Amino acid sequence: MEKEKQEALIRLDAIEKESKELRKIIENAGKSKNIMERVIDLATAIIEIGNKDEEVLEYNKLVNAGIADHILAGQELVIISKALNEGKTPTTFYYPYFNLTKKPGSGFFFDGYGSWRVGGSVASARLTLLNKELALYQGKQFEQIHYRHKVKN
């Protein structure tokens, strides 16, 4: 009986070890891809930063409270920016900007990016990005969320 118990514990330890290794493989699956390939919508941004992240928890509170859509869109952009920045805090901030007049039809479209530099101290702006490529990507990929945040009531 004691021998069977020890064998069972050994098997259990092996299963736990394999489970941890498998979990690590699953968690790192796709991590070698560029962040712009991994974050393609709000759902993948949440997967990237985790559903226990403070910004995701705040978003869920807003959704459950029935908050206005433009506020939800703002929080969605916070989550997306955080995911695209991969946990890094920029010292030069890049952000997408939009034009409200040139495009026939909708009157709102992505129109490039801007940037500014912070000297000396660490600063945080929740909707800014690490580089121009991320700003360009976010502006194009998430244009409709920006529209909901900035224009649509």
Can you describe what each PLM-predicted range is?
Residues 1-39:
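Short, low-complexity, charged amphipathic interaction modules
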Residues 89-124:
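Short aromatic-glycine-(Arg/Gly/Cys) micro-motifs in beta-strand/loop hairpins
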Residues 149-152:
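Subunit-assembly interface segments of extracellular/virion macromolecular structures
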Residues 29-102:
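The feature represents the first ordered module of a protein
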Residues 130-147:
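A short, charged, amphipathic alpha-helix used as a generic interaction element across diverse proteins
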